[in-house]
Regions:
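TPR repeat positional signature
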Residues: 38, 75, 82, 113-114
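Helix-turn-helix repeat elements of alpha-solenoid scaffolds
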Residues: 5-20, 45-58
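Long, ordered, amphipathic alpha-helical scaffolds
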Residues: 105-192
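Solenoid-like repeat scaffolds
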Residues: 21-32, 59-69, 96-105
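Residue-level signature for tetratricopeptide repeat
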Residues: 43-45, 81-82
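Generic helix N-cap/helix-start motif at coil->alpha-helix transitions
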Residues: 1-3, 30-39, 69-75
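TPR/TPR-like (Sel1-like) alpha-helical repeat modules
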Residues: 82-106, 132-136
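Conserved positions within tetratricopeptide repeat
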Residues: 10, 55-56, 92-96, 163
Length: 192
């Protein structure tokens, strides 16, 4: 990437931050951001390999949008950022959140066959088609170290236990009628 391209990306980030600041002023100290601008900067930071900038942005996001769980690709970018800034325990947790939000993204990144199991996909964020929008791959030079770490992490007992529990709950929820058992399963899923 040329210095001019890096400068353009930095200018985009600045413009988005300005628009978010104006949005907060417009709404009397609160954000509306119905355009979803808050989700754009991480991809831009990652394009220029500014992982500390991305981390600062995620800290800001967490503080200003505490009830926003993000969307799967955003969470995946957060996982990359945490890994690249040597926050491995947090990266593990975020990788599991990514899997929870979309079971296909990690497989897509690692060029693996999609995990196929019978589950209900209640949100368009959960569909396999979302994974096709992932612009990151284990083959990208700047992500080789992350890919190695992620490949190893998804083979750990910690990840297996999490994934198996999640898949088990999802499989039962697909056919479980409304009632006490379903309510208990939903609560258990949201505690994960």
């Amino acid at each position: 990437m040329t210095p001019k391209q890096v400068e353009r990306i930095k200018n985009k980030i600045t413009k988005i931050k300005r628009e978010l600041s104006a949005d907060k002023k417009r709404w009397g100290g609160y954000y509306d951001d119905s355009r979803g601008l808050r989700y754009l900067p991480p991809e831009l930071y990652l394009k220029i390999s500014d992982y500390s900038g991305a981390l600062r942005y995620y800290n800001w996001f967490d503080k200003n949008f505490p009830d926003d769980c993000g969307f799967p690709i955003f969470l995946f970018e957060w996982t990359i950022t945490l890994f690249k800034t040597k926050r491995i325990k947090q990266a593990e947790k975020k990788a599991m959140e990514t899997f929870y939000s979309n079971t296909y993204l990690i497989d897509k990144f690692l060029n693996k066959e999609f995990l196929d199991f019978d589950k209900s996909e209640n949100s368009n964020w959960e569909y396999s088609s979302l994974a096709e929008q992932l612009i990151y791959s284990k083959d990208q030079n700047e992500l080789i170290d992350f890919a190695d770490w992620l490949e190893n992490f998804i083979k750990t007992e910690k990840f297996y236990a999490f994934a198996n529990k999640f898949i088990g709950i999802e499989s039962v929820l697909k056919t479980e009628p409304i009632g006490e058992k379903r309510t208990k399963l939903v609560k258990e899923k949201y505690k994960m």
